[in-house]
Amino acid sequence: MKKQRIVVKIGSSSLADSHGGISKEQLSDHVAALARLKEEGHEVLLITSGAVAAGFSALGYPSRPVTIKGKQAAAAVGQSLLMQAYTEEFRKYGIVTAQLLLTRSDFSRKEQYSNAYATLGELLNRSALPIINENDSISLEELTFGDNDMLSALVSGLVSADMLMIFTDVNGLYDKNPQKNEDAKKYYFLPEVTEEIASLAGDAGSKLGTGGMKSKIDAAKTALSLGVSVFIGTGRGQEKFVDVLKGKGDGTYVGNAPQKEIKMNKQWIALHSVVSGQIEIDAGAATAIIQHGKSLLPAGVTNVSGFFKVGDVVEVMTQQGRVIGKGQCTYSAEELREIKGMQSQHIQARGERHNYEVIHRDHWVSL
């Protein structure tokens, strides 16, 4: 089997025991299956939930806390317990683990984003297994936004993974809720995530997790857009992840032939950057960018809105107000207002700092 880079996401419901805590049996089962992937020569990254589940009982909560401060306190205690449990299990297979705790803001800051990319790359080069969780004790997003589903999609894109496996307590996607409808039809393969498929998923999560099927479908759509194929399902035993790669997984495969992967810098611009202003361009410039893949030149700029610095990300819109993309600007807003609409030779004649492009095509993404 060809060596692949695999991101596996394990949710709280796939780790929990009957009391809502972490099941050692479940965790051991997952680790054994992850070790088999490594044994087959694949590179593996693990996105794991479960910090709250691992920590709430140690703080005296009778069940998973419902308040934000309770969840974050439980996560602060549980993260070290969860990591300790993983480390001890992986040690049995001679696998070195590494912990990364991320927040959504780490993705929006380009320097942190680049550092995460470099760190993960070095860990994989050293045959370590990165274990990634959202920093639950200080981050609100993981506790209210998808049980790490979207984090797993973003990480899979960041590392140019071949496949994202989202493991949960439901064996795939259905056209109806299978727990309430006996005639529910299971989707074994979906070439893409359509609006119809997205509308079928409810928001409700399981009792022990925060991510329902909707968050998993959203994550699958994001991963597919980044060139990563997806599996959503369940399974038990040492071969369950290897079986997914063989097409025998108990769930739904999403995505047809792999799409072209998106470079790290363009991923950051498309998904994580903060827009600092807007640039309006004429029809000729819009055609050159969209249809011919050209860079944006000062001559095509008709208006500048906002206050931004060199290197900030701006939206680009047509004169009819339609946003067509965004990119990193090589001029500040003040500089661009001075030279908008001017030909390159006229800018040079002014004797001012001159870049041929306002936005280079390597730092541009279409929307």
Curated annotation (Swiss-Prot):
* Record's keyword annotation contains Kinase: yes
The answer on whether this UniProt entry bears the keyword Cytoplasm reads: yes
Keywords (alphabetical) are: Amino-acid biosynthesis, ATP-binding, Cytoplasm, Kinase, Nucleotide-binding, Proline biosynthesis, Transferase
Where in or outside the cell it occurs: the entry states:
Cytoplasm
Q: Which sequence ranges are marked TM in the entry?
A: none
> What GO annotations for molecular function exist for this entry?
ATP binding; glutamate 5-kinase activity; RNA binding
| GO CC terms, sorted | cytosol
| Reaction catalysed by this enzyme | L-glutamate + ATP = L-glutamyl 5-phosphate + ADP
Cited SMART domains = PUA
Residue sites binding substrate per the record: S49, D136, N148
E.C. number: 2.7.2.11
Pathway stated in the Swiss-Prot or TrEMBL entry: Amino-acid biosynthesis; L-proline biosynthesis; L-glutamate 5-semialdehyde from L-glutamate: step 1/2
Sorted alphabetically, which CDD domains does this protein's record hold? AAK_G5K_ProB, PUA_G5K
The processes (GO biological process) annotated in the record are: L-proline biosynthetic process
Pfam families per UniProt: AA_kinase (PF00696), PUA (PF01472)
Give the PUA domain ranges: 276-350
In which residues is ATP bound?
A: K9, T168, D169, T210, G211, G212, M213, K214, S215, K216
Q: Which family does it belong to?
A: Belongs to the glutamate 5-kinase family.
Which HAMAP family does the record cross-reference, listed alphabetically? ProB (MF_00456)
Q: What does the record give as the function of this protein?
A: Catalyzes the transfer of a phosphate group to glutamate to form L-glutamate 5-phosphate.
Q: What is the name of the protein in this document?
A: Glutamate 5-kinase
Gene that encodes it: proB
